[in-house]
Amino acid sequence: MQSLQHKASEWSGVLTSNAFAIDDTNLFEKLGLQTFISLSTNFYNRVYDDEEEWFHLIFANSDKQIAIQNQYEFLVQRMGGPPLYSQRRGHPALIARHRAFPVTHEAAERWLHHMQQAVDTSSDIDDDSKIKLMNFFRHTAYFIVAGIELKNQNFQMPCKNAPSPCKN
């Protein structure tokens, strides 16, 4: 079985080494807290204004302000800043936290479309950091897709001598 990282690289087109180039520089120190707050706000404004009903509905039961806070706190922590997300919410556990949502290839691409626009319109992010961030986002989006697909496959696997699928 392929690792989730390998599958994420295959589907995203981003090598793991490029996805984790974000670790070569402390992007939190370089860009600052406000940049991540602005990026997350810009991103979620785009998501909540999305004209595609199927995509917009994914977020229908989520509070926009909480989504913004969750994202910027995660990004601050992942990009080298203080562990804001973990202090408030515990381990990020990206796959588990996204399991309730229909995170498909199509949804990942739509999510990435909005993130690319948010990154591109941020004057506070230099070009090199934009590339690193988008490589990370693209790889991570498909890491989540792969993880959810794997969990769904395992959930449906029949148990030996059982009349119905096991619940793993």
Curated annotation (Swiss-Prot):
InterPro entries: GlbO/GLB3-like (IPR044203), Globin-like_sf (IPR009050), Globin/Proto (IPR012292), Hemoglobin_trunc (IPR001486)
Keyword Transport: yes
Expressing tissues: Mainly expressed in root nodules, but barely in leaves, roots, stems, flowers and fruits.
Induction cue: Induced by ethylene and polyamines (PA) but repressed by gibberellic acid (GA) in roots. Repressed by cytokinins (CK, an equimolar mixture of kinetin and 6-benzyl-aminopurine) in nodules. Down-regulated under cold stress in seedlings roots.
Keyword 4Fe-4S on entry: no
Domain of life from the UniProt record: Eukaryota
Quaternary state and interactors: Homodimer when ferric.
GO molecular function, a single term: oxygen binding
Protein function: Hemoglobin-like protein that exhibits an unusual concentration-independent binding of O(2) and CO. Required for general plant development and during nodulation. May promote shoot organogenesis from root explants.
Gene assigned in the entry: GLB3-1
Binding site for heme b: 98
Organism name: Lotus japonicus
Protein keywords: Heme, Iron, Metal-binding, Nodulation, Oxygen transport, Transport
GO biological process: nodulation; response to cold; response to cytokinin
Protein name: Group 2 truncated hemoglobin 3-1
SUPFAM superfamilies: Globin-like
Family, as annotated: Belongs to the truncated hemoglobin family. Group II subfamily.
